[in-house]
From Swiss-Prot:
Similarity comment text for this entry: Belongs to the MnmA/TRMU family.
Domain of life: Bacteria
Keywords: ATP-binding, Cytoplasm, Disulfide bond, Nucleotide-binding, RNA-binding, Transferase, tRNA processing, tRNA-binding
Catalysed reactions, semicolon-separated: S-sulfanyl-L-cysteinyl-[protein] + uridine(34) in tRNA + AH2 + ATP = 2-thiouridine(34) in tRNA + L-cysteinyl-[protein] + A + AMP + diphosphate + H(+)
Sequence segments annotated as region (Interaction with tRNA): 151-153, 315-316
Lineage, opening ranks: Bacteria, Pseudomonadati, Pseudomonadota, Gammaproteobacteria, Moraxellales
Region (Interaction with target base in tRNA): 94-96
Listed GO MF terms: ATP binding; tRNA binding; tRNA-uridine 2-sulfurtransferase activity
Taxonomic source organism: Acinetobacter baylyi (strain ATCC 33305 / BD413 / ADP1)
Record: residues binding ATP: 8-15, 34, 123
Protein's name according to its UniProt entry: tRNA-specific 2-thiouridylase MnmA
GO cellular component terms, semicolon-separated: cytoplasm
Pfam family, one: tRNA_Me_trans_M
Residues marked Interaction with tRNA (site): 124, 350
Amino acid sequence: MQQRVIVGMSGGVDSSVSAALLLQQGYQVEGLFMKNWEEDDGTEYCTALEDLADAQAVADKIGIKLHTANFAMEYWDRVFEHFLAEYAAGRTPNPDILCNKEIKFRAFIDHAMTLGADFIATGHYTRRGESMQNSRGESYAPLLRGVDNNKDQSYFLHAVHGREINKTLFPVGEIEKPEVRKIAEKLDLATAKKKDSTGICFIGERRFNDFLKQYLPAQPGKIVLDNGKEVGEHHGLMYYTLGQRGGIGLGGLKGAAEGAWFVLHKDLENNRLVIGQGHEHPLMQSTTLWSQDIDWVAGEQDIPASGFRCTAKTRYRQPDQACTIYRDEDRNNGVRVEFDEPQRAVTPGQSVVFYTNEICLGGGVILHTDAPTPDFI
C-alpha cells in the first residue's frame, strides 16, 4: 500500500521539487500551503497570495491535491509574541527557528495526521538519519546536515524534536541547489526561476525598523565610543545588533581614524549604544557563552562532569567551532559552552547549535557571554 505524504508547499522551488521527487519515488503525495500571518488589507508587503498561486500552479502541473491551512493564531501565540518579548528585553531573536519548531513541524504534523498522512515532507536542505531509540525508549530520528554545504539548514531546524524528524522526509536534502533548479526547469514548474525568499516571513519586503516600531515603542538614546565619549543619538537599541557594521547613522566623526564603525555593546541599563572601530575589537570577543532550555534532537544528551566535546555554530553558515559543553546547574536544562578559540560578536537571543560530524545534536538560545563590559559602564 502506498504511503501518504503531505508536503509543505510554500510556493518556492525547493518544496515544489520535493513534491515532484516524492511522486517519482512512488509515494501518494498531497500538498499543504500554510498561511502563518494575517497581513493588513491593502498592503503590498505580503506575498502570500502570490505564493499560494505558485504552489497551486505546481500542484496542478504535477497532478496533486493542494490543501490550505491557516496557522496565523498559532503563529502569533507561539512565535510572534516571543519575538516581541525578546526584542523588548534587548536581545536579537531568530523567529525562523521558533517558527520551524512550533509551526512548520509541530502544527503541520498535527494537521497532516488529521488528513491521514504517514509522513510530512519539507523543502529544507537537511537529512534524516535512521530511526533509533533514546535511553527512555522513545523513537526518534537524528537530524543530519544537508548534502549541499552552502545551503545546509540544520541550524534552523535544531529545535525540532527527533520524534518529528522521524515523521519527516527531506527530498532535496540529498542533492545540491543547482540540481534542484535543473529538475524544476526540466519539469517546467512555475517556480523554476523564482528567487529564494529572504527575510522574516511576517515582515516580507518591509524595512525592518518600520515594521518593529508598529509593535514596540522606540526609545532613542546616546551613542558612545568605547571610551565613553558621547558622539550621537541612536533610534532605539532594538534596531542594532552586536557586530553590526554601518547603519549606525554617524557619518564622518571629527578627529576619528578612517575605517568602519561597529556595534560593540548594548548598555541596556543606561540605554546607550557603544561603538568602536576594528573588525576584531576586544569588546566583541568572547570564549564562553551560557544557554538554557536546550532542545536536544534526541530528547536528551549525556554531558559528563568533565564536559562534552563537539563543534558549534552561533550563527548560520559559520564554520564549525570546536568547543566543550558543560552542564549549568543554575539554569533549567542549561549549559556553559567554552570555545577553543575566541568568538566574534556572539549575540544574546541568537542560537548556539551543536554538532558531532554530520549530526546536528540540538541547541538553545544564547543568554549571555563573557565578552568584556566597557570600563565606563
